[in-house]
């Protein structure tokens, strides 16, 4: 693939976004409406997407992930906003794919950005790999938003706050990625899967090996799968 196209299993038009962007828009709207982080409002908006197609590019919910759906069902039944499962089998990429509004909104307060990156995952994806992937990716985004260059934020020594990852260590699987695993691999070792560790690695591999958005996006897309 060398340009944006339509089609696929959902027969979308070129430029129509899918589930992860819908959820990112829900999260962004919640931050705006609540003037900050409110987990319950986020979950209510995610449910509205599921039930009514809120923030969908087609007007209907489609391609909802199993882990997300189970968390929304639990929230509907209990009212508990932190309904994400902790099992390793639930370590999908749903929470990191919608993450961007958190570091953007809290870009002037890195401590809050990292705290809420973790909490934003726990609403639907509470496995430690999902939570730590969100913390790590939020740190990278914070660095870029503050003007740091790619080499700096992808260094294994980089931290958005002095000693943050020393005082708040990442789990082993995410720490390996942060230490640069993506710099020494190529497909098929790099996979566009729905597993959060492989998704994080694939995103960083695409970023590391390209110099502009178009090239990076195409590199990720051409991995295939999720």
State what each model feature region is.
Residues 1-226:
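Structured, active/binding-site neighborhoods that engage oxygen-rich ligands
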């Amino acid at each position: 693939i060398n340009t944006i196209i339509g089609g696929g299993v959902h027969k979308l038009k070129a430029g129509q976004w899918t589930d992860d962007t819908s959820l990112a828009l829900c999260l962004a709207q919640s931050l705006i409406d609540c003037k900050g982080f409110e987990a319950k409002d986020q979950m209510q908006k995610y449910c509205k997407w599921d039930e009514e197609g809120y923030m969908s590019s087609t007007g209907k919910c489609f391609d909802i992930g199993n882990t997300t759906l189970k968390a929304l069902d639990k929230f509907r039944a209990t009212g508990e906003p932190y309904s994400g499962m902790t099992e390793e089998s639930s370590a999908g990429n749903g929470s990191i794919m919608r993450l961007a509004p958190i570091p953007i909104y809290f870009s002037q307060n890195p401590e809050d950005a990292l705290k809420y990156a973790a909490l934003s995952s726990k609403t639907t994806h509470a496995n430690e790999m999902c939570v730590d992937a969100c913390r790590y990716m939020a740190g990278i985004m914070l660095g870029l938003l503050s003007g740091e260059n790619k080499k700096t934020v992808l260094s294994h020594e980089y931290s958005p706050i002095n000693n943050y990852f020393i005082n708040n260590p990442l789990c082993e699987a995410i720490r390996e990625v942060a230490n640069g695993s993506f710099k020494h691999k190529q497909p098929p070792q790099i996979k566009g899967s729905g597993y959060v560790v492989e998704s994080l690695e694939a995103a960083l591999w695409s970023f590391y090996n390209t110099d502009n958005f178009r090239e990076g996006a195409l590199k990720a897309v051409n991995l295939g799968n999720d």
